Structure formats: C-alpha cells, structure tokens
C-alpha cells in the first residue's frame, strides 16, 4: 500500500487517493488485499462451506509448467493456486478469490485458467480426492454461463459472519 499510494504522492495531493480509485494500481492492490483477508478468515470459509468440524489443512500450490525439450512448445501450462483446503473427508476445496465492485463474471478465458489450475493440480499431485472449485468473491458470481462449473460460492459477507 505504501509503495503504491503513499510514496507516489510526492506532492501531498489530498485528492491522490480518490484520483487513483478504479485505476489498475488500485484494482491490483484491492485484489491482493482481498486475498489476504480471505487467508485470514479460513475458519469462516470452512464454516460457510459447512465443514468446520472436519479436520483440514490449508496450503498454496504452484507448478511451473512443462515444455518439450526439442521444440520448446508448451506441453502443460503452469498454474498457481493461492488457497487449497485439504480435508480429511477426501475432498479438496480449490479456492479462487476475486475482488470486484459488483458480481464477478467468469469469462471464457478465466474459465480456461480455472480449469487448467484444477487439471494441473490433479495431474501433478496425483490426488484421488474430490476437488471442488470454490469461488470467493466480493459480491457473488453472475449467474449462468461459466459460473455453472463452480461447485461452491462464497461472498465477502461470509467472511464476517
């Protein structure tokens, strides 16, 4: 926050913060801040998903991807998952966290990224557990379209119950 919004305000402009609202810098910061809030509220996430009594562990996971050594073509794309909840009931919640000022719409491109993350995780970890796609958004998902592929949905309000 300091590097993006305090240090950059070298002239002491009292309207600097409001002038940055909606900018790519502000949007990026808000997304990172929302992810941090989610990470600090895992017990509320578990409760909202209905498995607070199930023993579980929280992880992140990443995979660099794989390229053909001869052609250099991508064999498997890389993937990063910021929040995995690995439950003792043979289920893993693969959590995507998205901050927006309204309902979040999953585009075709975003759907492909989410599916790639899940496929890479299952393939590389060789898990036999059920993997549930879980979206945590500020104001919910736009119904229909690619949101039908999401198993569990939570909103920011669920983090503060």
Question: What label would you give each PLM region?
Answer:
Residues 1-80:
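Accessory nucleic acid-recognition modules appended to NTPase machines
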Residues 2, 94-96, 106, 145-148:
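Short conserved micro-motifs at the rims of enzyme active sites and ligand-binding pockets
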Residues 42, 81-101, 114, 133:
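Conserved catalytic cores of phosphodiester-cleaving nucleases, focusing on short active-site segments
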Residues 72, 109, 143-144:
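Short glycine/threonine-rich loop-to-helix capping motif typified by GTGT followed
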Residues 100-120:
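Mg2+/Mn2+-dependent nuclease catalytic core
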Residues 119-129:
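Arginine/glycine-rich "motif VI" loop of SF2 helicases in the C-terminal RecA-like domain
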Residues 127-161:
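Domain-level recognition of nuclease-like catalytic cores that cleave nucleotide substrates
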């Amino acid at each position: 926050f300091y590097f993006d919004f305090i240090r950059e305000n070298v002239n002491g402009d009292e309207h600097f913060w409001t002038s940055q609202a909606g900018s790519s810098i502000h949007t990026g910061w808000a997304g990172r801040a929302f992810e941090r809030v989610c990470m600090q509220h895992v017990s509320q996430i578990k409760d909202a998903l209905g498995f607070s009594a199930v023993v579980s562990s929280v992880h992140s996971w990443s995979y660099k991807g794989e390229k053909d050594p001869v052609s250099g073509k991508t064999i498997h794309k890389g993937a990063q998952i910021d929040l995995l909840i690995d439950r003792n009931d043979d289920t893993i919640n693969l959590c995507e966290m998205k901050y927006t000022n309204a309902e979040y719409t999953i585009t075709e491109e975003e759907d492909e990224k989410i599916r790639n993350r899940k496929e890479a995780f299952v393939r590389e970890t060789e898990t036999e557990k059920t993997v549930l796609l879980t979206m945590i958004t500020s104001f919910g998902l736009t119904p229909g379209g690619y949101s039908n592929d999401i198993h569990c949905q939570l909103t920011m309000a669920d983090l503060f119950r």
